[in-house]
Amino acid sequence: GAGDCSTHELPGFPVLDNPYNRALPVFLWTDAVDHGKGMNEYDGIRTCDQGIFDDPKDITLNSNIKMIFNLASNTLVNQHGDINRTAKLLKDTSKCEFIVCSDLFMTASAKFADLLLPGVSMFEEENITKPWKFTEFLGFNNKVIEPLYECKTEYEWIRELAKRIDLEEEFTEGRDYSQWMRYIYDDLRTREPELPEYDEFREKGIYKFEEGHYPISFEKEVKDPEHHPFPTPSGKIELFSTKLWKTPMKDFMPPIPRYVAPPEGPEDPLTKRFPLQLSGWHSKCRTHTVHDNNLNLRKLDPQ
């Protein structure tokens, strides 16, 4: 992970209210599949309006996860820890009973789908390209060809599904995909007036923001601590976390930062049976698994 130091807002579809009003860390979805019922705030369970600095009380899940929509993501298996455990969980159909996956390739995650739908590539749809955390630009992805072999974007097939259950108007709000693109961009321009008109941006394909002031971490807290306290119980920088000390996780997450031996690490008794440890890495020629099978890039940057 990395901290966000972007100085501009980025576009995105509006998010609907979650009627269940529970959220969990993405890396703990496997626990929620296996033993979700009863998971609580110490497992990272929050209401949808709470953040990492909130102090929730008596927040629990009342059910295990039984169905997963895995769209444009390889997080089910490939981009997750302990994939052997994850695969074992997914093979047990008494746990997660139905998985919907939309993807371009038969990824490690797609192999576990009960319903596998072919997605469209970046060459077959229009989209707005956003930077990851740091770079100050927006790009426009212009469609090169129409989707092949009756493939549909996620928006299209979810719209068709919504229509069959009489929720099309609530889902689309009267806009098709291209109208949503324009609406989202124009809405962003009300807060980022530096951006050009939508049609100009679409034609040029990229816009780089003018260089401006970059955020300084905790600037407000340092300059005006009275009105901008730190998000801690004391409102100050804490070397000892009283919040962690009061939790049942204090041995695994100590209130004073210190080294905690990881499971299956060099101190684990398992090393007597398995003395070798494999650490994987990947080079700059791929992003996660994207381009891992690109032979031309492998020649340029062997791994």
Feature map (PLM): residue ranges:
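Gly/Ser/Thr-rich helix-start
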Residues: A2-D4, F13, K236
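Non-catalytic, well-ordered alpha-helical segments in soluble enzyme domains
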Residues: Y155-T172
